[in-house]
Regions:
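N-terminal acidic leader/helix
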Residues: 1-28
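Aromatic side chains
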Residues: 3, 13, 32-36, 50, ...
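Acidic-enriched, low-complexity/disordered segments with a strong bias for Aspartate over Glutamate
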Residues: 7, 23, 37-38, 59
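Acidic, low-complexity, intrinsically disordered interaction modules
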Residues: 26-35, 39-44
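C-terminal basic regulatory modules in eukaryotic proteins
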Residues: 39, 43-72
Length: 72
């Protein structure tokens, strides 16, 4: 069983939680796809857990800082 996500932040969180990255690709349209080994079916649960974590708060601050830097 595998878990796939196109969200870079969730992918990093899953790696931090010990999930093994099997593949990382970039489509012609620029979209990323990360595939993880998920033998216990915990990918969805961990992705939901990410939304309420300190990691999500950090990620949001990084995004806001990028908006400030790249505003033109």
């Amino acid at each position: 069983m595998t878990y796939k996500t196109s969200d870079l932040s969730i992918a990093a969180y899953l790696m931090m939680k010990g999930m093994k990255l099997l593949d990382a690709t970039r489509a012609h349209n620029g979209q990323f796809m990360f595939e993880f080994d998920d033998p216990n079916g915990k990918g969805v649960q961990l992705a939901i857990e990410f939304t309420g974590s300190e990691c999500a708060v950090y990620d949001n601050h990084v995004r806001n800082l990028k908006k400030i830097l790249y505003r033109n």
